[in-house]
């Protein structure tokens, strides 16, 4: 086919800067939302609208560090024109508060009753996916190892091939333009135009099978009478994010839910997050149930095992020595054992007093005293560590 009969593709020369103004403003707003999410993440992860959302796609959450757009009054009243010297950047504050440089207390702060209006906050619609991306970026299962008899494989799609035909949505613009430039240069005219059919390059994908180790997480929660509404909410908030993290980041992680008071039993996920119980507390019962599950269902030769237990620490004193013995037995079969204690008022904890004597490096604990500690507990239990790569 002669060059005159070749179908030509052109590169648009139109100045699209004006068309992008709305898009640029939207991107700037999204950047501010993402920055606000990152700065407020410890408080956001325990927002009731999120924890009680059952994983819905979009939730409304208050972000107090994000102001709505407004015009501010110029207190200085200086004569000026609207042209700057070019040193300002996007996001710079150009208004002043008229306080003469003195730091003022915000509304609703300080001693005595005031007459100032309250501080408004911005209620943003944020997808669970956005929060997960910000939250889970630095988390991973610790000490994950390749196990024997590992036949498990996951399918992974990678854009790792370039072809001359494909979907228009997958066209590789850079490679297409380079191909056209080379062809035109060989003809004596180094230019990106015209682009012919033979210059087109499309990205395409291949399905890659990767070996993957199996893992099981044992979620154990104290549901006794001493665990009040706040304590159970904190424990369930942690396990809510833990299950989201595991299912988002790992293809093959089983989760077993175990609730206990004086007795322990395996429950469904729905019962674990909604059912309330009462009674006394014997924590050794849940460790026995965990060992029973491991012996019957999850061999340490085939599974990476991670037990996590949340309680208020108010255990039967005579049961503490038994708990320590069972935890040490669990750690011989597990990659890591995590204990979270919800202790808002820093009271004496019989269980933590016993656990502080455990010196094993695979035993991790965290005391939660406020809502933001759910975030910090997740970071502590699932922290990334160099050298903890799957062997």
From Swiss-Prot:
Pfam families: DUF444. Belongs to the UPF0229 family. Residues 98-115 have a biased composition (Gly residues). Residues 1-31, 80-117 are annotated as: Disordered. Residues 21-31 have a biased composition (Basic and acidic residues). It comes from the Bacteria. Residues 1-16 have a biased composition (Polar residues). The lineage of its organism: Bacteria, Bacillati, Bacillota, Bacilli, Bacillales. It comes from Bacillus cereus (strain ATCC 14579 / DSM 31 / CCUG 7414 / JCM 2152 / NBRC 15305 / NCIMB 9373 / NCTC 2599 / NRRL B-3711). This is UPF0229 protein BC_0551. PANTHER family: UPF0229 PROTEIN YEAH (PTHR30510:SF2).
């Amino acid at each position: 086919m002669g060059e005159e009969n070749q179908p030509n593709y052109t590169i648009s020369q139109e100045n699209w800067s004006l068309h992008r103004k709305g898009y640029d403003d939207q991107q700037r707003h999204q950047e501010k939302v993402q920055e606000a999410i990152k700065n407020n993440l410890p408080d956001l992860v325990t927002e009731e609208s999120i924890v009680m959302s059952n994983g819905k796609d979009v939730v409304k959450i208050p972000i107090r560090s994000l102001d709505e757009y407004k015009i501010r009054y110029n207190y200085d009243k200086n004569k000026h024109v609207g042209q700057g010297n070019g040193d300002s950047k996007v996001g710079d504050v150009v208004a002043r508060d008229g306080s003469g440089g003195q730091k003022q207390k915000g509304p609703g702060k300080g001693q005595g009753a005031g007459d100032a209006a309250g501080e408004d906050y911005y209620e943003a619609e944020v997808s669970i996916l956005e929060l997960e991306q910000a939250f889970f970026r630095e988390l991973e299962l610790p000490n994950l190892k390749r196990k024997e008899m590992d036949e498990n494989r996951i399918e992974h799609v990678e854009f790792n091939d370039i072809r001359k035909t494909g979907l228009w949505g997958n066209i590789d613009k850079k490679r297409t333009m380079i191909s056209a430039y080379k062809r035109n240069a060989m003809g004596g005219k180094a230019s990106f135009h015209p682009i012919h059919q033979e210059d087109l390059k499309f990205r395409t994908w291949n399905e890659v099978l990767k070996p993957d180790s199996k893992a099981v997480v044992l979620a154990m929660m104290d549901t006794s009478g001493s665990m009040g509404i706040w304590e159970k909410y904190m424990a369930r908030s942690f396990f809510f994010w833990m299950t989201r993290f595991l299912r988002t980041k790992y293809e093959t992680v089983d989760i077993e839910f175990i609730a206990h008071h004086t007795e322990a039993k395996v429950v469904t996920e729905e019962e674990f997050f909604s059912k309330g119980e009462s009674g006394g507390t014997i924590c050794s019962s849940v460790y026995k149930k965990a060992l029973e599950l491991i012996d019957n269902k999850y061999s340490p030769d085939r599974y990476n095992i991670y037990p996590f237990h949340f309680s208020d620490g108010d255990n039967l004193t005579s049961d503490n020595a038994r708990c320590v013995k069972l935890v040490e037995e669990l750690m011989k079969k597990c990659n890591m054992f995590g204990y979270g204690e919800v202790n808002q008022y820093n009271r004496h904890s019989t269980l933590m007093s016993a656990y502080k004597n455990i010196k094993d490096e695979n035993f991790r604990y965290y005391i939660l005293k406020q809502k933001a500690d759910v975030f910090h507990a997740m970071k502590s239990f699932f922290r990334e560590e160099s050298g903890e790569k799957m062997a």
